Amino acid sequence: MAVPKKKTSKAKRNQRSATWKGKAAVAAQRAMSIGKSVLSGRAQGFVYPVREADDEES
């Protein structure tokens, strides 16, 4: 069974954690930005389905 030979230092662990959290923060910011643009009607970079009104169905 594969096991690490030496214990990972706290500095290395913290550095990896900070990188991971930074990437997560960037992804969250992009998601919020896209969500805001969709809700405000300014989204132009992608296509998304729009619910049709009930009047058109009858």
UniProtKB/Swiss-Prot annotation:
Start and end residues of each stretch annotated as Disordered: 1-23
Disulfide bonds: none
Domain of life: Bacteria
Keywords: Ribonucleoprotein, Ribosomal protein
InterPro entries reported for this sequence: Ribosomal_bL32, Ribosomal_bL32_plant/cyanobact, Ribosomal_zn-bd
GO cellular component terms given for this protein: large ribosomal subunit
MF terms in GO: structural constituent of ribosome
Listed Basic residues bias regions: 1-15
Annotated GO biological process: translation
NCBIfam families tied to this protein: rpmF_bact (TIGR01031)
Record-stated family: Belongs to the bacterial ribosomal protein bL32 family.
Protein name, as recorded: Large ribosomal subunit protein bL32
Organism annotation: Parasynechococcus marenigrum (strain WH8102)
Gene that specifies this protein: rpmF
